[in-house]
Amino acid sequence: MLKTLPPTLREKKRYVAFEIISESEFPQKEVVGIIRSAVLIYCGIHGCSKVNPWLIDYRHPSGILRVSREYLDLLRSSLMLFDEYKRNPINIRIIGVSNSVKHIREKFLHVSHEPYYKVIQKLKKRNLVK
């Protein structure tokens, strides 16, 4: 069995709160496609693998992304320059950046973190989350 990496060797992450401004609503699967295509257009395949955008949570119109710390500027610029999805105008606004999901939810999205914490605790009791 493989050992886990010590914290000093793990990849550092940042969490980005964003808002999608558009005439239509998008489901979570489409938001993943929007973000991936924005990063692919601006950075290419190699840049997308380095940025490593991962959608943590999305509720229309705002969401949370997890990103590699070193390539945060590439993500910011690629999301700002993305202006069209499926021939519809779209604008992605970055609300804020933090190093924890809890701070993103409370400071930028103004949502209490407690309901999410309770769900995680229930899953831990059922041994579904480690």
UniProtKB/Swiss-Prot annotation:
It catalyses: Endonucleolytic cleavage of RNA, removing 5'-extranucleotides from tRNA precursor. This is Ribonuclease P protein component 2. Signal peptide: none annotated. Its main location: cytoplasm. Its EC number is 3.1.26.5. One of its GO terms (biological process) is tRNA 5'-leader removal. GO terms for cellular component: cytoplasm; ribonuclease P complex. Belongs to the eukaryotic/archaeal RNase P protein component 2 family. HAMAP family: RNase_P_2.
